[in-house]
Each structure stands twice: as C-alpha cells, then as structure tokens.
C-alpha cells in the first residue's frame, strides 16, 4: 500500500477517460448530480500482481474545464509534491500547446518520475505526429488511445518500473491501532493532533531521504497505546498553499490507506461539505474503520439534545447507506472529549477483529432469512442455506445460496443490517458475499 500515481494535464486531453480505463471504472464521468463525480477522482489499479492508487488531480478543481493557468499550476505542484509517478497527458490531435509547455517546464524542474502520455493516438500516422512531444524534454512519449485502451498495457508496465520497491515485513506492533486524522483544512486536525501528542510532534518531523511512504509514530496517551499515521510530506509546507481543499484530500490518501481507523474531522460551524464526502468515500473504498468527530462544538451556542439529534441525522443522511459509525461532538481546542475519541477508536479497532462462531451466526440469521427471503427472480426462488464469517482483516460474511447471481444489492444491505442489529460492528465496514452452495 502507499504507492501513488497522479494524472495531470490541461483540460480536455482525456485525463478522466484514462483514469476510468486504468481503474476499470464504468461510472458516467459527466454526471451532474451532487456526489456522482467523486468516485472518478480516486481509484485503485491492479497490474501484474501489484496494486497502486491513482488520482486525477483535475477532479478536485472547481470549474476545471476553464483553462486557468493558476489552477493547472496548482494541480501539477500537488502531483509533484505528493505522487511517486506523474502521468502527464497531452492530446495528440491538437499537438503541443503553450499550456502543455508550461506544465512540462514545472515537471522538468522537479525530480519526480514523469511519463508523457500522448493520448488519442488511433493509427500509425498518429504515432509519427506524437514525436513532437519529445520537445517536452521528459523522455519517450507513450502513445495510447484511452477510449479503446490501446497502449495502456505498455504504459502500466512503465509505471511499474518507476514505482518505488514495496517495503518488506513491517516492524509495527500489529496489536495496536493505526490512527489517521483526516479532514478538510481548518476542521481542526492539527489541534486534535496537538491535544493527543503535545509538543513532541516536531521530534519526528525531518527524516533525511524519506520516501512518500507513511510514517508511524507510536504514542501512549491516557493509558492507551496507538500509532499515528502521517506521510513524509504532510508536516512541511510546499509550493502549494495548505488550505487548498483538494490538496488536503490528496494528502489524506496515504494516511487513510495505511491506517486501521480514520478519525474524520468535521467543522460544526460548516456541516458536511463536498470534500468531507470525498474523504469519506476514500475511507469507505479502503474498508477502514471510522470515527466521525464534530469539532468546534464549543462555538455552537445551542447544545440542546434537539440540536444534537438534528446534527446527527443530517450527517448520517449525507453518509448513507453506511450509517453505523460513532459520532462524537468535541472541541480539540478546549480538549473537550479528547479521551473519548481515543477510547472510541480503540473500540472500533476491536470491532474489526470480532469473530462470530458459525453455529451462532446460523442460529440467528437463518430464521431471519426464512422470514424475509430474497425476492424471487424469473419465477425462481432463491434459498440461502448457510452462512459463515470469513478469515479476513475486514469483517466479511459468505452466504451460500442456490442462485447467488440473483441476490441483489438491496438484499445484501438487508443482511448486513441484520448482522449489525445483532452484533456490534459500529464503525467498521462489513463485506457481504453470496456464493453458490
């Protein structure tokens, strides 16, 4: 885990199409509904037995279809600072533009591995015209057609060559939770970090020659042992302003991927915003434990139970269908309920390793399934005969049925909700698999 590839380039060169091709995503990338575009900004790529994360940096830029030099520069600086490999996408149909040259100049000055991707190369003649991208001074251009997938295999092979070697066996104590504190800028991440670990946070700031792998710092606070997950770049200021919202999302990726439990900080004075949903989505996609903290609760005047209930309902509604997570109202500045945060993180971590005996699972679940069976499909009745928990890091359950292919997503959610109703998995995702008996 932890290798990160960023896609950069001016608008309309095919970055999103390439992203969808590499992640094998089938989502409509032009959907306008709120929340529908966030899936295309972050994904996982599997190639030749290895896996890495990929981000389309343009996905977090508001109005990214407008060609603003400043916004393009920000994207490129983010990629240079955070990614292991940068894919610089250019449009072979339009050729080199002044904006392309500006991006290339920034990339040349960096020491980051860069692959020039000449997109929309559909035939032999196009291959010849792609030679003009040598003018970037960034090595051989890789000719692809993102729409059809032509050339992407060679591109991925090259990405594999440039990615840093995977780490060997970890020296971490696997019995201790790895905590990542994530959230939008100014939501209170630094204040909570300081409340947890005080002034020693600067002791581990500078590690010469460090890669972009996550840093694990072990702490003991309030009698609880834990690791705080950080990334090499997160404590230093780069050329990109720290308060850029999409920058904070990209910086969260490594910490999330290398954690067990994520503390998602929300600002009580602002509620749930689009970047909160982006970060939540990444936590979900990586099947991490979740504790949601409503910070700056000291600034809210009306703290009545009615207001608290309204806050809770609004937040769970925004994060649906996953709503079974602890939600704490805190103030990192005044240290209100700080111990409760760590205590809850440890509880969520324990829930991830909950094991239910098979006989008990069947004793509870089979009568429920018999009373509310899966809907019949094409006149055929679906019968679930048996259920067992799988030996996985994330709680996972296999239900054995005669026609597993006809069990739809709503019924899987029903099964998950029944498991949650009978056993405490608060804060941790559950995977439901339907297999043939």
Swiss-Prot record:
Keywords: GTP-binding, Nucleotide-binding, Repeat, Ribosome biogenesis. One of its GO terms (biological process) is ribosome biogenesis. This is GTPase Der. Belongs to the TRAFAC class TrmE-Era-EngA-EngB-Septin-like GTPase superfamily. EngA (Der) GTPase family. It comes from Porphyromonas gingivalis (strain ATCC BAA-308 / W83). Residues 3-167, 177-353 form the EngA-type G domain. Transmembrane segments: none annotated. GTPase that plays an essential role in the late steps of ribosome biogenesis. InterPro entries: G_ENGA, GTP-bd, GTPase_Der, KH_dom-like, KH_dom-like_a/b, P-loop_NTPase, Small_GTP-bd. GTP 2 binds at residues 183-190, 230-234, 295-298. Associates with the 50S ribosomal subunit. It comes from the Bacteria. Residues 354-437 form the KH-like domain. GO terms for molecular function: GTP binding; ribosome binding. The keyword Repeat applies.
């Amino acid at each position: 885990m932890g290798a990160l590839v960023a896609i950069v380039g001016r608008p309309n060169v095919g970055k999103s199409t390439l992203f969808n091709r590499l992640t094998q995503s089938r989502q409509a990338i032009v959907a306008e509904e709120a929340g529908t575009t966030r899936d295309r900004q972050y994904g996982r790529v599997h190639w030749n037995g290895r896996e890495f994360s990929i981000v389309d940096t343009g996905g977090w830029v508001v109005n990214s279809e407008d060609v603003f030099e400043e916004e393009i520069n920000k994207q490129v600086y983010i990629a240079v600072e955070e990614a292991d490999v940068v894919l610089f996408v250019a449009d072979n149909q339009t050729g080199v533009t002044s904006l392309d040259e500006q991006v290339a100049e920034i990339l040349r000055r960096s020491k980051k591995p860069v692959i020039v991707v000449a997109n929309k190369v559909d035939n032999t003649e196009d291959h010849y015209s792609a030679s003009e991208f040598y003018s970037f001074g960034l090595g051989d251009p890789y000719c692809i057609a993102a729409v059809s997938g032509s050339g992407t295999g060679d591109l991925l092979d090259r990405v594999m060559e440039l990615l840093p070697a995977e780490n060997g066996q970890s020296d971490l104590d696997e019995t201790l939770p790895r905590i990542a504190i994530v959230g939008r800028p100014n939501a209170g991440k630094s204040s909570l970090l300081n409340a947890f670990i005080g002034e020693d946070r600067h002791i581990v700031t500078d590690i010469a020659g460090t890669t972009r792998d996550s840093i694990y710092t072990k702490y003991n606070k309030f009698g609880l042992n834990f690791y705080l997950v950080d990334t090499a770049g997160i404590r230093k200021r780069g050329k990109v302003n720290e308060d850029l919202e999409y920058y904070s999302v990209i910086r969260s990726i490594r910490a999330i991927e290398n954690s067990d439990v994520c503390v998602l900080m929300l600002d009580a004075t602002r509620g749930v915003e689009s970047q909160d949903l982006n970060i939540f989505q990444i936590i979900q996609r990586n099947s991490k434990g979740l504790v949601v903290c409503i910070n700056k609760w000291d600034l809210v005047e009306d703290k009545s139970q009615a207001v608290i209930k309204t806050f809770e309902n609004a937040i769970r509604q925004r994060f649906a269908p996953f709503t079974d997570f602890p939600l704490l109202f805190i103030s990192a500045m005044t240290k209100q309920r700080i111990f409760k945060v760590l205590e809850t993180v440890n509880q969520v971590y324990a829930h991830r390793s909950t094991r239910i005996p098979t006989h008990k699972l069947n004793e509870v679940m089979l009568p429920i399934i018999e009373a509310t069976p899966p809907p019949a499909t094409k006149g055929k009745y679906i019968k679930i005969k048996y259920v067992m928990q799988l030996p996985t890091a994330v709680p996972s359950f296999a239900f054995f049925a005669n026609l597993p292919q006809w069990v739809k997503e709503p019924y899987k959610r029903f099964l998950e909700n029944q498991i949650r109703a009978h056993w405490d998995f608060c804060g941790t995702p559950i995977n439901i698999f339907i297999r043939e008996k």
